[in-house]
């Protein structure tokens, strides 16, 4: 259904944002931006 598709997309986006956030934080901590 459309709802489950939207939920799957949101979960995928959330994971991507978490990964990007972690990379950004690591970059800031190590000052290698």
From Swiss-Prot:
The keyword Transmembrane helix does not apply. Disulfide bonds join 27-33. It is found in: Secreted. Coiled coil: none annotated. One of its GO terms (biological process) is defense response to bacterium. The keyword Acetylation does not apply. It comes from the Eukaryota. GO terms for cellular component: extracellular region. Signal peptide: none annotated. Keywords: Amphibian defense peptide, Antibiotic, Antimicrobial, Disulfide bond, Secreted. Expressed by the skin glands. Shows antibacterial activity against both Gram-negative and Gram-positive bacteria. Belongs to the frog skin active peptide (FSAP) family. Brevinin subfamily. This is Rugosin-B. It comes from Glandirana rugosa.
């Amino acid at each position: 259904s459309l709802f489950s598709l939207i939920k799957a997309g949101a979960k995928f986006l959330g994971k991507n944002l978490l990964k990007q956030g972690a990379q950004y934080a690591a970059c800031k901590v190590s000052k290698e931006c």
